[in-house]
C-alpha cells in the first residue's frame, strides 16, 4: 500500500515495506520502465502543519538499450530518497521545486508518482550490454560483437592529406 490517509499521518508515522509493480499505471508514460517490481522501504511521517516527510529506499531493475550495439542491457537502481509533501496552500512551499504538492480536494497522499520520479532520476543514462562491447560498424551497421564486418578500412579524410604528406617528408 503506497497511498495513505493524511489524517492518520498527523497522529502517527507509517512504516512502509512494499512493492511498486512494474505493471502499475504510474509507469504508463515512463521510459524506461522497470523490468521487475520496485522494492520500497521507508517511513512516512508528519513534518509540520500540512507537511509530510518520506525517507526510505527504492530498489529495482531496469531493461535498457546498449549505447554501442543497441542490444539488450540491464541495470539496477538502488537509491535512498528523502521527499517532502505539502498540502496546497501551506506557507512557503508553493514555489519550492523539491516539494510535492498534494491535491487539496483529496485527503490522500500517494507516494507512487514521487517514487517513480526519484527512480527515473537515478536510472543509468549510459548502459552497456558488457564492458567490452564493440558496438556497430559505422559503415555497414554490422554488430562487431558477433564478428568483424566485410567493410574495407576507411579511407583517410582528404582534408588531412596535407598533414600526412608533411609527416612523411619529416621521416
Model-derived features with residue positions:
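Structured interface patches
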Residues: 1-171
Amino acid at each position: 500500500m503506497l497511498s495513505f490517509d493524511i489524517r492518520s499521518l498527523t497522529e502517527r508515522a507509517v512504516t512502509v515495506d512494499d512493492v511498486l509493480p512494474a505493471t502499475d499505471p504510474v509507469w504508463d508514460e515512463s521510459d524506461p520502465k522497470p523490468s521487475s517490481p520496485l522494492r520500497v522501504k521507508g517511513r512516512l511521517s508528519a513534518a509540520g502543519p500540512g507537511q509530510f516527510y518520506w525517507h526510505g529506499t527504492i530498489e529495482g531493475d531496469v531493461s535498457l538499450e546498449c549505447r554501442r550495439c543497441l542490444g539488450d542491457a540491464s541495470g539496477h537502481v538502488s537509491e535512498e530518497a528523502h521527499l517532502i509533501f505539502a498540502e496546497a496552500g501551506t506557507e512557503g512551499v508553493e514555489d519550492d521545486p523539491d516539494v510535492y504538492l498534494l491535491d487539496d480536494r483529496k485527503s490522500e497522499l500517494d507516494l507512487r508518482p514521487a517514487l517513480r520520479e526519484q527512480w527515473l532520476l537515478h536510472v543509468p543514462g549510459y548502459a552497456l550490454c558488457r564492458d567490452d562491447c564493440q558496438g556497430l560498424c559505422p559503415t555497414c551497421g554490422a554488430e562487431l560483437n558477433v564478428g568483424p564486418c566485410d567493410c574495407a578500412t576507411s579511407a583517410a579524410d582528404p582534408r588531412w592529406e596535407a598533414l600526412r604528406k608533411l609527416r612523411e617528408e619529416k621521416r
